[in-house]
Design a protein with these regions (language model features):
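Proteins synthesized as precursors that undergo proteolytic processing into mature forms
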Residues: 101, 110-114, 314
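Conserved N-terminal glycine-rich FAD pyrophosphate-binding loop of Rossmann-like flavoproteins
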Residues: 109-131
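Glycine-rich active-site loop/strand segments that organize a redox cofactor
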Residues: 123-159
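Conserved redox-cofactor binding core of oxidoreductases
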Residues: 161-265, 284-285
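Glycine-rich loop(s) and the adjacent beta-strand/alpha-helix scaffold that form part
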Residues: 272-314
């Protein structure tokens, strides 16, 4: 990891975290500046409201919680606060460990997020060795069509451009734990579906425990292995930390966050904050307000994502 500077991590950690999902990143996009949002649907709210709006809808559903200083039972300080111990959060924690960055991973649940036994990476060496190649232009267009043009194409580009490097990084870690990480050469024939022409890119990477994998690691999921990795370096996930709000300075820069814990409110002060909390698919009110098309025609009802990260970052 010598070629990755501390600054490059803090400005682009989501690029590494992106390998954790097949084609997307956990977490929410940062609030955009007025220049970036010129001509878009996001715009400033009426003067004095302190809210960003999407159309006529406040991005923050309700007022920001007001927590008195006297209600804070503990204050922590760190260089990097990672909010959420799911796919993106744990990948970021491992990279921060490698770079020697002081960090806190705050997770509201009692365990790291679940993972599958595969992920997607674009044009990795193993793909070329199998005589295949991902058509990135076609894949980019397929993803945009699949999401009705509403996905963040900047995130897709990060995955298209950088997932191969991240795959090499993840593969080394998994291999050291006794896992065989292999490209599925039977996938990605370039077409699929019934009665339609659907592009299926060769991107699937599987990982399974080798015969020589130590028993204590053989049944662990990727994020559990990542947790063990950071534990061995003296770090741990802070569980039972439910995000209440982000804290900011007078200029509006994020300075950390306040969490609700069983002991009371805890303020984590951080020079840098990385939001890896997931989306809001399990919050019907927010879905109706911000993404009514998805709410009207849901593809899945199994999500457990509620909006603390998106809510707080709005």
């Amino acid at each position: 990891m010598e070629d990755i500077s501390r600054r490059s991590f803090l400005t682009g950690a989501v690029a590494v975290a992106g390998i954790a999902a097949t084609a997307g990143l956990a977490g929410c996009a940062p609030q955009q500046t007025s220049e970036a949002t010129a001509g878009s649907s996001a715009q400033a709210a009426p003067a004095g409201s302190g809210k960003t709006t999407i159309g006529q809808t406040p991005a923050w559903l309700g007022d920001a919680p007001q927590i008195e200083e006297s209600d804070i039972v503990n204050t922590m300080e760190t260089e990097l606060l990672i909010v959420g111990a799911g796919n993106a959060g744990m990948a970021a924690a491992v990279l921060a460990t490698d770079l020697g960055i002081d960090f806190v991973v705050a997770e509201k649940a009692g365990a790291v997020g679940a993972t599958r036994n595969w992920y997607g990476a674009v044009n990795i060496p193993e793909c070329a060795e199998a005589g295949k190649e991902v058509d990135t232009v076609k894949l980019n267009n397929v993803l945009r069509q699949a999401f009705g043009g509403k996905n963040d194409m900047r995130v897709v580009k990060v995955w298209l451009d950088e997932s191969a490097d991240t795959h090499a990084w993840v593969k080394q870690i998994m291999s050291d734990y006794g896992y065989e990480v292999s490209f599925d050469s039977d996938q990605g024939l370039g077409h699929g579906g019934v009665g339609i022409d659907m592009y299926v890119p060769p991107i699937q990477v599987n990982y399974n425990a080798r015969e020589d994998c130590p028993e204590e690691y053989a049944k662990l999921k990727r994020n559990e292995l990542f947790e063990d990795y950071i534990n061995k370096q003296g770090h741990e996930v802070t569980y039972g930390f439910d995000l209440v709000k982000l804290t900011t300075d007078d200029a509006g820069a994020v300075t950390g966050a306040i969490f609700d814990t069983k002991e009371g409110y805890v303020h984590v002060k951080a020079r840098n904050t990385l939001m890896t909390t997931g989306g809001y698919a399990a919050n019907a009110e927010m879905l109706d307000s911000l993404n009514p098309m998805s709410s009207a025609k849901p593809a899945s009802q199994t999500s457990r994502y509620t909006p603390p990260g998106c809510d707080a970052a709005a």
